[in-house]
Curated annotation (Swiss-Prot):
Keyword Transmembrane carried by entry: yes
Protein name: Uncharacterized protein R836
GO cellular component terms, A-Z: membrane
Membrane-spanning ranges: 6-26
Membrane-related topology note: Single-pass membrane protein
UniProt signal peptide: none
Superkingdom of the source species: Viruses
UniProtKB keywords: Membrane, Transmembrane, Transmembrane helix
Organism (species): Acanthamoeba polyphaga mimivirus (APMV)
Main localization (coarse): membrane
PANTHER family (alphabetical): NGG1P INTERACTING FACTOR NIF3, PTHR41774
Subcellular location as annotated: Membrane
Length: 148
């Protein structure tokens, strides 16, 4: 197992615990059974990039198989924000200088991908990223079954 596989396993196990707690809590609130809430086959991926690289990243995500929802592909959502960091000794910052605090406009790209393609999609995206270190988040997703 590599580090990404271990991270994915951690998030799946985390989901199982959270899903159980949510089921118990919601059942107590309204007495309804939510057993039809199921773990999705997809993972939500969130990536932070400068505005200049949004199209490059979205293209890489789509080509790798991310962003498929029903009869649509290349699906994503983007929001603008401010990224903040300090580059430490030994780094090669794309924006800013070593040992200085830097703030820059970034775009947060959100999309989904099949759980079995997460590691591949992250590796492909890391090849086209502009930053030395790519910031990203992975979230397990819940869906309602068709009979709910």
């Amino acid at each position: 197992m590599n580090n990404i596989d271990i991270l994915i396993l951690f998030f799946v196990l985390l989901y199982v615990g959270i899903a159980f707690i949510l089921k118990v809590y919601i059942n107590r609130l309204n007495g309804k059974n939510i057993d039809k809430l199921v773990l999705s086959d997809n993972i939500k991926i969130v990536i932070f990039v400068p505005e200049t690289h949004v199209d490059i990243i979205i293209e890489a995500l789509g080509k790798a198989g991310a962003g498929c929802i029903g009869c649509y592909d290349y699906c994503s959502f983007a929001t603008k924000g401010i990224g903040r960091y300090r580059s430490l000794e030994g780094s090669s910052p794309t924006i800013g200088n070593i040992n200085e605090f830097t703030s820059c406009e970034e775009i947060k790209i959100e999309t989904i991908c099949p759980r079995n393609k997460v590691a591949q999609i992250i590796r492909i995206t890391q090849k086209v990223r502009p930053y030395e270190t790519m910031g990203y988040d992975l979230y397990p997703m819940l869906n309602l079954s068709n009979n709910f």
